[in-house]
């Protein structure tokens, strides 16, 4: 099992949604009812410096387009802006491919901290339903949230429209 493998590899702290049955010497065990949420919030606290304004765009369709339009409008108005999403990480003249529309919380915290170091003031990011449901954006405070639309999609993951809507 994963916990045993982690201990064998030298882990000193275990964070789990399951209670450990036996105590172990030199091992700290932390229980959390939502490990993903804890990871996201902790990541944001450790790498807490980020651009001044954060904007999230969610919805079934149009996230990438709206994110890119918003990015272009701010850039044309000489704002120090970045965008994060399906089309990657864009800022200044850089464009980096990302693995997911909404990155994992540790990597996202790192990206935001790096953008802050580069004096970026505005970040527009896509907030996918998977990313929201998996708590990847927890710990972030958005200045603006944009909801494009909701249609029958991603039901293989969310199972029904109510769950899909609630993730948004």
Regions found by a protein language model. Give the residues of each.
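Short, basic phosphate-binding NTP loop
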Residues: 1-58, 65-82
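Short loop/helix-cap segments at secondary-structure boundaries that form the rim of catalytic
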Residues: 18-27, 90-92, 135-141
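Glycine-rich nucleotide phosphate-binding loop and flanking beta-alpha elements
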Residues: 20-22, 63, 131, 153
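Short, charged, surface-exposed secondary-structure boundary motifs
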Residues: 24-26, 39-43, 92-94, 154-159
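Ser/Thr-centric signal marking residues that sit
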Residues: 58-60, 65-66, 86, 102, ...
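Short glycine/serine/threonine-rich phosphate/pyrophosphate-binding segments
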Residues: 63-69, 127, 131-132
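Short beta-strand-centered segment that lines the nucleotide-binding/catalytic pocket of NTP-utilizing
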Residues: 78-92, 128
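Flexible active-site lid/hinge loop adjacent to a nucleotide/diphosphate
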Residues: 95-96, 100-168
């Amino acid at each position: 099992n994963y916990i045993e493998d982690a201990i064998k590899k030298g882990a000193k702290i275990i964070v789990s949604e399951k209670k450990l049955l036996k105590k172990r010497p030199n091992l700290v065990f932390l229980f959390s009812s939502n490990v993903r949420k804890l990871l996201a919030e902790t990541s944001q606290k450790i790498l807490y410096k980020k651009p001044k304004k954060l904007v999230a765009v969610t919805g079934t369709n149009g996230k990438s387009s709206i994110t890119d339009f918003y990015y272009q409008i701010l850039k044309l108005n000489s704002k120090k802006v970045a965008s994060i999403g399906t089309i990657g990480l864009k800022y200044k003249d850089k464009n980096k491919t990302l693995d997911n529309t909404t990155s994992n919380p540790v990597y996202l915290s790192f990206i935001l901290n790096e953008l802050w170091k580069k004096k970026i003031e505005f970040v527009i990011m896509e907030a996918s339903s998977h990313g929201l449901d998996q708590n990847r954006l927890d710990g972030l405070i958005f200045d603006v949230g944009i909801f494009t639309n909701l249609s029958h999609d991603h039901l293989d993951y969310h199972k029904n429209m109510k769950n899909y809507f609630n993730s948004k």
